[in-house]
Structures are given as structure tokens and as C-alpha cells.
Amino acid sequence: MALEIGFKRIKREVGIKRCVIIDGNVGDVYLDDKNQIVDLKKYLTEMLEDLKYDDIVYWDRVNGIEGDISSLKITEEKEVEGEEYSLDDEGENQNTTISNGNFKEPSEVFNLVFQNLTNKNRKTVFILNWSDYLFSNGGQHDNEERQNLTLLGKSIKDKKVNYLSTDVNESTIILITNKLSNFPLSFYQANPEVSTITLSKPDRLERRRLLEKIEAGFELKFNPGETLLNSSRTNEYIDVLEDFTNREIIQMAKLSRKEEKLTFDKLYLLFKYGEKDNPWEKLAYEDVKNIKKKLSERVVGQDEAIEKIEKTVVKAY
């Protein structure tokens, strides 16, 4: 259960680590503990509610902040001292004032994190989702981005270590990104306060579990008395969905209701390649048998290449 292992690790390390970075298959949907299909935001929120956090604040660049921030400290940003990450040319630090109630600017939300992460009277978790669009690619960061990272790094380091706390889950930051490379190595590598967790695509057991959930959503042709999960080929159907996300499996079910009834094989080909017929099935045996001769008639002086093509085609056929 690859996804389940990832989520269990997140639940275990949130509150122990001061920063948890989640990357990989973060744009998918998942089956939660109640067997409901939810996105990552909903899954994390349910998990954090179970951990009894006082404040759960979610942020992305499009919608800004979601969640009750009435108990949080909100003031103007002040310059902070700290290590700047991925330095290129030095630039002047600039103060930023929180001017938008939705906190859509990264500098605004990072300032909010800095002011509240060290509050020992409340347990607060910040979920910051920028996927691909907050920091520059390739580890190159401009002055504002370096300042944001400085604020974040200082928030993590400034929280006092309390090893005798009665509540083991302390305030923390969860960062969501498609690619871990969006962060400079110096931010998370060899940093004991930062954990990186990669969400994989669903494994075989998880694909079967999803199919059990949405089986009624497939409209397919089967032999009499057979269904998607009660067929002599059920294991093949699950295996062929290797490397699919849960979203793609759900989309495939929707496609089955949009088209005329197809077999699972034809639906798979239509969804993945845009054609419901396998071109290899249309290839006549005689054509495969004589492919070397036919290619030699059209191409001169490429005997070695023709032999390689022949072997590849025969093997695939």
C-alpha cells in the first residue's frame, strides 16, 4: 500500500518535524479512512483534525488563505536575520506589508507563518501549497524568494525545543510541491527539522480498492455473468493500470459511459492512445514474415538497421 505508507509517515512526522515537504503525486485524489474519494487538501485536513490542532491554515497562490486566522497574530512584516538560501547576486532586502486580507502574496503568508509558528500557547499547522509556481525553477531564486526562504528557515529554527511537552504534536509547516527540486538543497538536506515525503502513484492493492469503490461507474462489455471485479481477467485489468493515477482511473470510468460499450481492453487503448483498436492486431502474419524483404526493396544499404527493425517487429508481434 504505497500511498497508505506515505500518508502514515506524514501523520507520524507532522508535529515531530517542524517542516514536512510533500512532493510527487500531490495532484491526485485518494481514498481516505472512511473510503471517500478526497483531494490532498481534504485528506490532510481530516488527518490534522484528528491530531487536535487548534488552527489549520491552508494557503495557495490562487485563493490565498483558507481557514480561521482570527486567533493568529497578524502584523506588518519586519526584516529578519538568517541564512539566505541559493544566493546568487546580493540584493537589498525590502520590507513587505500585509495589505491583502486573502494573503495571496507569498511574502504575506510567510510573514504570518514566522509570527505564529513559535507561539507556545497554540498548536498551529500551516499547509502551503504552491505545487510548481511559487519559487523559480532550477534552484535559482530572486531576492524576494530568498527572503521568503529566510523567513521560513528562521521560523523553523526559532521554535524552542520542548522535549518534555505533554502534547507531542507541536506547530508545524506542511509544504506541498510537485517537485522537490523547487527547493534549494540547503533548505532540507541534512536538516533534522525538515522531512521530505514523496507520494507515489497507487500500487496494485490501492488500484483494486479504487476499482471496488467506482466499479458501478464503468459501463463495459463482459461475458455473461462477469463484471469488472468478477472476471477471469480481473487481475490483468488491475495490472494494466500500473502507473495510472487515481484521477486517470476515474477518468477512464467516465469515458466508458461516454462511448458505446467497449471491452476493457478497447477502453484502455482508447483512453491511453486515442484508438480503441490495437494496430498490431491488424498486422497480417504474412506482412510480418516478409517485413525484411519489403524494407530491403524500399531502403538500400541499411541491412543492419533493417535486421534490427525486423527483430523488434517480430518480437512485438
Feature map (PLM): residue ranges:
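Conserved helix-loop functional segments at active or binding sites
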Residues: 216, 220, 297, 311-315
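Alpha-helical lid/collar subdomain of P-loop NTPases
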Residues: 245-285, 289, 293
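Dynamic helix-loop-helix/coil hinge segments at AAA+ ATPase domain boundaries and subdomain interfaces
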Residues: 1-5, 276-308
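Hydrophobic transmembrane alpha-helix bundles
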Residues: 167, 210-213, 262-277, 300-305
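Short, contiguous clusters of charged residues that form electrostatic/catalytic patches at enzyme active sites
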Residues: 150, 154, 307, 311-314
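ATP/nucleotide-binding catalytic cores
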Residues: 1-264
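Generic detector of short, locally flexible boundary/turn motifs and exposed helical patches
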Residues: 138-140, 160-165, 270-274, 292-298
